[in-house]
Amino acid sequence: MITIGIYLAERGLIPDVLLRLFIKRFSLSRLVEANNEEKKMSVIDGLKTGPIAENTIDANEQHYEVPADYFKAVLGPKLKYSCCWFDDESVSLGEAEIKMMESYLERAKIEDGQMILDLGCGWGSLSLFLAERFPNSAIYSVSNSNDQIEHIKNIAKEKNLENLHPEVQDVNSLNLNQQFDRVVSIEMFEHMRNYEALLQKVKHLLKPDGLLFIHIFCHKETAYLYEESGEKDWMTRNFFRGGIMPSHDIFSHFSEFEVKKTWKVNGTQYTRTLNEWLKIHDHSKQKIMSIFQNHYENPSIHFYRWRLFYIACSEFFSINNGKEWFVSHYLLSPKQ
């Protein structure tokens, strides 16, 4: 049944209202499976062994090596590929991108003149924002995607941002010679599988009084892995192989850092973000199909697959009025 539903959805043959109803019910059923304290602790224990990131090649192919032109066509003007902040109905996607990034400045206590590392920088929305806002700061941007780093370099060159230093690095072998006042990581830890090793690396990159700021999506209580075990694991198979759904309290289980402060961002903020991307995706169908024709054997399936991704995630974050799955911000300081 699930296989037939996915087959039809990836061809645009199921009305959105039915898709959303099915996805909401399916998400709630998966929550019942995952909501187990023993399983959660097993997942957290597993985040203390093995490679920092798994399936990095698959993850890049699924998300980050999708043509840059696609993200330029679908995301907001800053290309922020993560949750944005709509503080009222009139806020545009572009304004919401900036509002969320401004919240990082306040919460991470970022100031001009600091050395800042954007770890898992995506398409450079935050790195470019910081480099322009803080001309006396040095901003280092790290991603394992060649396309992303080339995009950031091109924009930095256009804007003459000499204080921005983007480079391709695999987090498993992360090697930087600098020490930083702030390390900022936006929606990267969800792709990591050894938090303990990664936090140890970050601790060595920070100055003694440095701070780590993290933005993740999470569940209010439980943690679980995205693993492909059957037909129902469409999200893992197509978008999130090697990923994890963290719990809100995830960072309290690791000894390298002290959690100084946490903030919850209601999941409906991500629902709105995803629905805005979906609107643009639909409005730009002709352009996107042209981009996909040069990249995929079956561009139509990929067009509808991305639609399904946005719809699925938007419903997911709306459950329980955005209080079941949501976004969390953390300010952490290294334990001495």
Where are these regions (language model features)?
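A short glycine-rich, Lys/Arg-flanked "PGG" loop and its adjoining helix->strand segment in the class I
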Residues: 196-211
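Conserved SAM-binding strand-loop segment of SAM-dependent methyltransferases
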Residues: 158-172
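Substrate-binding/catalytic lobe of Class I Rossmann-like enzymes that use SAM or dcSAM, i.e.
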Residues: 218, 224-324, 334-336
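A short acidic, Gly/Pro-enriched loop at the edge of an enzyme's catalytic core
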Residues: 172-183
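Conserved class I S-adenosyl-L-methionine
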Residues: 113-122
